[in-house]
Regions:
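Charged catalytic cores and adjacent phosphate/nucleic-acid-binding surfaces used
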Residues: 57-161
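Extended substrate/RNA-proximal surfaces in nucleic-acid metabolism proteins
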Residues: 1-83
Length: 161
């Protein structure tokens, strides 16, 4: 469970992957690609959720880890593009961690690939419904997006924001 507590995440990292964050993330992306290839759905959400607890590792070794991570992530984006799937920009963690899933650092590449996006707060608390939305739209605009994909009358449409 990539959304589990750090303790559970760290335990799985050590027990299942011998402490190798790279192996854990490789497996996560392998399964993600398999899901995108074999399932029929419109939206992929939480694409980089694996980094939620991994950020504590990235913070110390960012320069060493990021090149291989970004390469793997780009391979997943290529599959998303080929399959024509919408990517969710999820703001649920914005208040707590000042980040989204997918992370803002990926938006330019997603735009360059022509991957459509939708924005969602994934909110479980009505008081936090709008948390991070304006920041997400701002980041999208900064990275070249002018539209988001919205479901209207049972059909997906690109809507300017």
């Amino acid at each position: 469970n990539v959304g589990a507590s750090f303790e559970i995440y760290n335990s799985a990292l050590n027990e299942l992957y011998g402490g190798s964050l790279k192996k854990m993330i490789e497996r996560y992306f392998e399964l993600t690609v398999e899901m995108i290839e074999n399932c029929q759905f419109d939206i992929v959400g939480h694409l980089d959720k694996i980094t939620d607890n991994a950020e504590c590792f990235f913070s110390e070794e960012m320069d060493n880890l990021m090149p291989w991570y970004l390469s793997m992530f780009d391979e997943v984006l290529q599959v998303v593009k080929r399959k024509g799937v919408i990517l969710e920009v999820n703001t649920k963690k914005f208040l707590k961690k000042k980040r989204t899933f997918v992370h803002f650092r990926h938006l330019k590449r997603m735009k360059d690939l022509g991957i459509p996006v939708m924005v969602n707060s994934d909110c479980h608390n009505p008081m936090l419904m709008e948390e991070g939305l304006s920041e997400a739209y701002f980041a999208l605009k900064e990275n070249g997006y002018r539209t988001v994909r919205v479901l209207r009358d049972g059909k997906w449409s690109d809507v300017e924001f």
